[in-house]
């Protein structure tokens, strides 16, 4: 059984998306038990439309829903202990849930998660990891927005956590890890990135295979399983990729409807275009993972539909089933244990 708490009021559409999304996820994973946090007046009628979900859930009424435009500090002051977002996160502390999923305000969700769950021992700052479609399948990119201007040690931590996530998600023994840089040569890039590369290489971490520096086009190629960067460049890369996917989809749609011949050609090529659309569907890779906390937090896109939210639940389910938290803790313990041993004076 996997216990998943949901911030039912989070996102642009709240329970109108979260509840049917949870119902879809339950169809795929019948061993889920949901703990729902929301405003009863908005949720009761929607839940009644999904009797299987209702039977597999417990519902907690909450006074407050965090707004999508609220500042993190305001959301903390107003919603601590009372909002659906806070209570969904706190369900992990109360041992009622193994993972929390929310489509709410990213800044507020991160602030509440850090305040409520705290960071793991040895982790200075958390990271947001995104699952990224590539020519070879999927890769993980982190950080995509949590820590702007991460230093070398924080990038080292991200490499450890990203490697653990890749082992949990892709089931590879030693995932390849690359540092995003402006070139692959050792002399290029900011000092923090070059120092992080040295730290990762010298640490010789058991759970990852350090590839070296990678460039922006390596992300989509799937050159490595994990791409490590700081939050500013990672977020720009993510938004640029999402925008490019929409742009290509619009180009194809316009091209296929321009002339009668193009429309006829589309009929014959429809299956190929359907496969392309499936590959580029952002709903299939919805669900950013907050790494470095004493609990698993999944962030869905705020504008996700029911299928997109269900995909975010799928990510949380997989992370619990494959022991993400334990893998990160074990890797951190090995790394920091080795560092402590090296620091001891020689007899």
From Swiss-Prot:
Pathway it works in: Lipid metabolism; phospholipid metabolism
A molecular function (GO) term: phosphate:acyl-[acyl carrier protein] acyltransferase activity
Pfam families in UniProt: FA_synthesis
Keywords: Cytoplasm, Lipid biosynthesis, Lipid metabolism, Phospholipid biosynthesis, Phospholipid metabolism, Transferase
UniProt GO BP: fatty acid biosynthetic process; phospholipid biosynthetic process
Lipid biosynthesis listed as a keyword: yes
Protein's job: Catalyzes the reversible formation of acyl-phosphate (acyl-PO(4)) from acyl-[acyl-carrier-protein] (acyl-ACP). This enzyme utilizes acyl-ACP as fatty acyl donor, but not acyl-CoA.
Similarity section: Belongs to the PlsX family.
Subunit relationships: Homodimer. Probably interacts with PlsY.
HAMAP family documented for this protein: PlsX
Entries under NCBIfam families matching the protein: plsX (TIGR00182)
Record's protein name: Phosphate acyltransferase
Organism: Sinorhizobium medicae (strain WSM419) (Ensifer medicae)
